[in-house]
Amino acid sequence: MTAAVTANVVTLPAAEPAKAVRDTRPLRLITCGSVDDGKSTLIGRLLWDTKAVKEDQAATLQRDSTGKQNDLGLPDFALLLDGLQAEREQGITIDVAYRYFSTDNRSFIVADTPGHEQYTRNMATGASTADLAILLIDARLGILEQTRRHATIASLLGIKQFVLAVNKIDLTNYDRAGFEKIAHDFREFALSLGVKQITAIPMSALKGENVVYSGQAAMPWYNGPTLVETLELATVRSAQSVGFRLSVQRVSRPGESFRGYQGTVAGGSVKPGDSVMILPSGMVANVSKIVTFDLVRNAAVAGDAITLVLDRQVDVSRGDMIVAIDSQPQSGLAFDAQIVALQPEGIEPGKRYWLKSGSRRQRVQVQPIAQLELKTGAWAPAQALWMNAIGKVRLSFDEAAVFDPYDQNRSTGSFILIDPDSNNTIAGGMITGKRTDLGGIHKEGQRVLLSLPADLADQIMASELFASRRDETEVRRVTAAQAADIWANAASDI
């Protein structure tokens, strides 16, 4: 007879869902939008509610707000930001103001930028280092042209996280339908910019509703996060993937036995023994030593200010770039870029300007190609670009220029244009790609067929740059007649 065995069934507790890993690194953010949408008031309220305002500052704010108080009897929080005399007199923001605040979970660096059209260049400056953009919109007015301009500039500068802060919602009697229409319209516009990560929040910066504390008592229909809750969950821009980059700012020669190249590491890392290349010359050397103010370092990473010592005497000047030999930037005479025009005279077609990128300064001819239509998000052909226009241009250099695309490295992919006549900075720009001499955009794996006189080809093949990439090339020596036939057959494909 077989005995029955009763199995004990053990019920395991359900596994808890994996928790999202919170990014606790300091977050850099920018407030932008049209004039009088409440950017300075919002930051002032953030500082006030996160207890970032010291007692003496609070007393000064209460005193300076006398006679400026609103119907609620609240201080004028914007005064915490408007530091210039002209700003206080006009009640507007002109300069970029940086402020710091923190919560129990994270610290923040916020840039308050001007909304007026004539100060667009200051807004671009603030956006160039930000991880996230808070785009303010007056709930009564909806999306304006300057709103679209600021969103576009932020997107071009690589910001992919947006908070759509629909401010002054209290002045619309907390109109839910109006808020949802603004959020819908902006999401449609943002798709044309390639921006998909958008958090829309209805708020009253003056009253502090949905800023640090919930505004659900006034807006029971909104159950989303507050502004601070959203910021605490945002991510810092991911590290860019290019190799070592050092733009030489100064050649240090304190004595006959020492020669070092000073600058701030703009990408990647470096250590003694690494092979590097000097561009645009193409010379190769090894890193002998890395020196800082009072230390000899074992390595250096992006953001470090260093003096680099090489193992041999090479010709290096201010403006040259020292790069990892196995991860080189693009070098050439022609590049495509996107720019923001910053001066009333705009960009004249074919005019020669100074281009400054890092410590390098070169002559360049700028040819406008297209201008962004802010209302539609479409690009239209353009012969010139006037103040505040966002455009695509072609850059042509007399001597080889060296860049990374901006989306790969912000430091080595950005530049400003300087008018040689007035010395004004007339545009800021971002490199999108290299153009070959045949007019095509440089792409990974693309081949270029050139027909050169034999003596010129021999000079090119004798260079160190060519030698370092010899295994990537194919050389065929042919007669002039054969070259003409090859060219005729290939031209239609180039």
Curated annotation (Swiss-Prot):
The keyword Nucleotidyltransferase applies. Pathway: Sulfur metabolism; hydrogen sulfide biosynthesis; sulfite from sulfate: step 1/3. It catalyses: sulfate + ATP + H(+) = adenosine 5'-phosphosulfate + diphosphate. Residues 167-170 are annotated as: G4. Residues 204-206 are annotated as: G5. Belongs to the TRAFAC class translation factor GTPase superfamily. Classic translation factor GTPase family. CysN/NodQ subfamily. With CysD forms the ATP sulfurylase (ATPS) that catalyzes the adenylation of sulfate producing adenosine 5'-phosphosulfate (APS) and diphosphate, the first enzymatic step in sulfur assimilation pathway. APS synthesis involves the formation of a high-energy phosphoric-sulfuric acid anhydride bond driven by GTP hydrolysis by CysN coupled to ATP hydrolysis by CysD. Heterodimer composed of CysD, the smaller subunit, and CysN. This is Sulfate adenylyltransferase subunit 1. It comes from Rhizobium rhizogenes (strain K84 / ATCC BAA-868). The gene is cysN.
